[in-house]
């Protein structure tokens, strides 16, 4: 049975493998990139086909990050219906998360519409509901990696759980794909050859299925032609090609490519994802699935570096939780390890349980070679890598910062980005949305250790934050020369930003000596913790990603007009901000009802369908709970005037909720359903409202 450390390391390696495969395959995913066109244009793929400022969101990685949250929200025995609720809860309607290709065309779009219409899973994805073509597209296997990772060494259970999860949108051969890929990942924790891993996956599906048939055809061809994957690809095209299977992206031809990449890649990650990419068809899906399996089996390897370094432990997702969308891969691997241990009936480490719902950040650099997404500016004289040369008592590693021949007055920034804007990306794939993961008032702590090689030692550092809209840099402490004899502790409080979000948090470095400085600076135990304050002044925000900076949104039209937020909707609509794990807070907003009956603020928001809200509903003031349906927790007569400004304040402390209007307490209620969540604005029905300043203050 794998140890806790081995589980964590292999999940981390597997997710890196998934991310590498998706990033490598994505540029040639569109169907216009035929097999012949990829071959003639790129020949042998041995590196990324495109450089990215930051790789934007992708449905292949959205699903593994978000759908596993069913185990958080509904427990370890979550049903297919629970996973269906999870789909609804974390996806904004028709932007982000899925390929919104149309009802009856996109399997995920179809399932989402069914769920919205009240058809529960697994009926939402059943052949009886949607027909065989829609039910057997490739999505059955591309979202399920996490179900394998939380079942290390238990392929049978991984297959069962993944099939339940996949049944939200898929059926038939689609479920076979889910079983195979998740079981192969689970088996990869224990097995040492790719042949064994493939057989473990196939053992969980019907041997007479088409999925097993195409896999066996590939394995048989490999026995006869072990050195010619292109001949195998020709066989797949002739006998199992797209012309034989209807729909936009059927699972069977792509299953053949996935197994082909696995067996011809011979258990080596880079070759596996390269074959999956060169083979065309659904390149990011196939390379992503194969990369997840092989990455888990192989574990981290130095030979991955050309693909691993650009990822930098950073992944963008595009659900409705803006801080979750800034995914730190080692931290997510730790979350999955907690779930894996719970499913095995074991108690996770106490600190990891805190991480599971942490209102803040903790980067320990414990995963081999991990960087936690830290960055440098400028790039040419400062370089980063995960290192084991120095570490603290609680970690196997630290961040090694190479400072290469700095002259007097030269330096730069070493930082983590808690917020992203449109300019940080080359495209708008899957429309990610972000809210800052670091807030004013929170405390930042870290350790530094200087290892000077050359120079007169006068290298100084100072902590800082950078603001998101103005690019203003705020130094938050005096300049110091770091210790060269051991770890030195640093601590600062994020200063008031005058209503502007935090885009960078880190350290400034500058050399004040006469001789050129060459050496290393090590950073360890970086954390952001404690209560904070979110202040959003609409005058300081801009419109991006179809919404407003520092907000995620679902339905309605959210714009900036005359220095205020303007919301307009024909049904329900929400906009959210703040950390996904806020607990006891007061959410205050300057709200002006303009039309309609519903004008609310929200707290402990865990998605589109799980939150508390309070404010005006018709001729009443209300406190409500939303849990895929509305429960009124408290109500009182109150008829708001259209066009008049009101200050709404919703306070949640423990299981106590209260609403104040213009500073006067109006309602109280008690409910213990939600312990944490983001905050925001809501209209539960058609109408318009204008909103001025919004504040979210930890209590």
Task: Tell where the protein language model's regions lie, with residue ranges.
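An N-terminal structural lobe/cap that precedes and organizes the functional/catalytic core
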Residues: 2-66, 83-84
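Catalytic phosphate/nucleotide-handling subdomain of diverse soluble enzymes
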Residues: 20, 24, 31-43, 170, ...
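Acidic catalytic motifs of isoprenoid enzymes
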Residues: 51-134
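Accessory "access/gating" subregions that flank catalytic or transport cores
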Residues: 112-135, 144-155, 163-168, 182-280
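Catalytic cores of secreted or luminal carbohydrate-active enzymes
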Residues: 323-414, 535, 541-544, 582
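Extracellular glycan-recognition regions
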Residues: 362, 372, 381, 463, ...
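Extra-cytoplasmic beta-strand recognition segments
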Residues: 365, 420-459, 490-494, 526, ...
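Short carbohydrate-recognition loop motifs
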Residues: 386-427, 554-573, 620-623
């Amino acid at each position: 049975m794998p140890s806790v450390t081995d589980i964590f390391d292999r999940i981390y390696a597997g997710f890196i493998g998934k991310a590498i495969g998706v990033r490598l395959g994505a540029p040639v995913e569109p169907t216009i990139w035929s097999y012949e066109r990829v071959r003639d244009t790129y020949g042998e793929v041995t590196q990324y086909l495109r450089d990215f400022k930051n790789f934007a969101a992708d449905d292949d990685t959205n699903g593994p990050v978000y759908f596993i949250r069913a185990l958080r929200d509904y427990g370890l025995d979550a049903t297919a219906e629970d996973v269906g609720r999870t789909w609804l809860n974390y996806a904004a309607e028709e932007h982000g998360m899925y390929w919104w290709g149309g009802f009856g065309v996109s399997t995920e779009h179809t399932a989402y519409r069914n769920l919205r219409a009240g058809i529960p899973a697994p009926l939402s994805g059943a052949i009886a509901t949607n027909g065989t073509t829609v039910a057997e597209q490739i999505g059955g296997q591309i979202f399920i990696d996490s179900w394998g990772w939380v079942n290390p060494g238990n392929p049978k259970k991984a297959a069962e759980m993944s099939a339940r999860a996949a049944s939200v949108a898929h059926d038939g051969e689609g479920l076979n794909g889910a079983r195979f890929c998740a079981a192969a990942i689970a088996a990869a924790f224990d097995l040492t050859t790719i042949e064994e891993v493939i057989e473990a996956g196939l053992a969980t599906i019907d041997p007479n299925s088409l999925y097993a048939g195409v896999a066996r055809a590939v394995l048989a061809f490999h026995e006869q032609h072990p050195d010619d994957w292109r001949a195998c690809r020709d066989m797949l095209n002739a006998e199992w090609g797209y012309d034989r299977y209807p729909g936009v992206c059927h699972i069977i031809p792509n299953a053949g490519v996935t197994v082909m990449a696995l067996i011809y890649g011979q258990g080596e990650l880079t070759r596996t994802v390269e074959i999956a990419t060169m083979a065309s068809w659904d390149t990011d899906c196939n390379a992503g699935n194969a990369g997840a399996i092989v990455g888990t089996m192989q574990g981290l390897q130095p030979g991955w570096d050309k693909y691993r370094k650009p990822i930098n432990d950073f992944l963008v997702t595009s659900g409705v939780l803006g801080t979750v969308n800034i995914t730190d891969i080692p931290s997510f691997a730790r979350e999955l390890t907690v779930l894996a241990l719970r499913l095995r009936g074991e108690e996770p480490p106490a600190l990891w349980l805190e991480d599971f719902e942490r209102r803040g950040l903790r980067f320990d650099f414990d995963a081999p070679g991990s960087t936690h997404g830290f960055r440098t500016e400028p790039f040419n004289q400062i370089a980063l890598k995960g290192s084991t040369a120095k570490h603290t008592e609680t970690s196997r590693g630290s961040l090694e910062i190479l400072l290469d021949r700095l002259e007097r007055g030269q330096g730069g920034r070493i930082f983590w980005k808690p917020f992203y804007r449109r300019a940080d990306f080359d495209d708008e794939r899957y429309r990610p949305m972000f809210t800052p993961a670091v807030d004013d008032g929170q405390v930042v702590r870290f350790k530094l250790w200087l290892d000077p090689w050359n120079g007169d030692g006068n290298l100084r550092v100072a902590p800082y934050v950078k603001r998101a809209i103005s690019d203003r840099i705020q130094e938050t402490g005096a300049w110091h020369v770091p210790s060269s004899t051991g770890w030195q502790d640093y601590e600062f409080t994020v200063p008031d930003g005058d209503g502007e979000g935090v885009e960078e948090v880190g350290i400034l470095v500058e050399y004040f000596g006469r001789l050129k400085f060459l050496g290393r600076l090590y950073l360890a135990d970086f954390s952001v913790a404690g209560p904070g304050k979110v202040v959003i002044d609409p005058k300081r925000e801009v419109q991006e990603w179809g919404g407003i900076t520092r907000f995620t949104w679902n339905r309605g039209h959210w714009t900036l007009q005359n220095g205020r937020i303007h919301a307009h909707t024909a049904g329900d609509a929400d906009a959210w901000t703040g950390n996904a794990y806020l607990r006891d807070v007061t959410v205050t907003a300057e709200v002006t009802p303009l039309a309609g009956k519903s004008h609310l603020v929200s707290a402990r928001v865990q998605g589109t369908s799980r939150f508390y809200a309070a404010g005006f509903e018709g001729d009443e003031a209300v406190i409500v709970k939303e849990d895929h349906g509305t429960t009124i927790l408290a109500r009182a007569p109150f008829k708001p005037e259209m066009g008049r400004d009101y200050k709404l304040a919703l306070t949640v402390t423990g299981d106590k909720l209260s609403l104040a209007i213009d500073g006067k307490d109006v309602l109280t209620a008690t409910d213990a359903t939600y312990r944490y969540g983001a905050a925001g604005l809501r209209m539960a029905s058609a109408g318009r409202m204008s909103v001025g300043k919004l504040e979210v203050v930890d209590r």
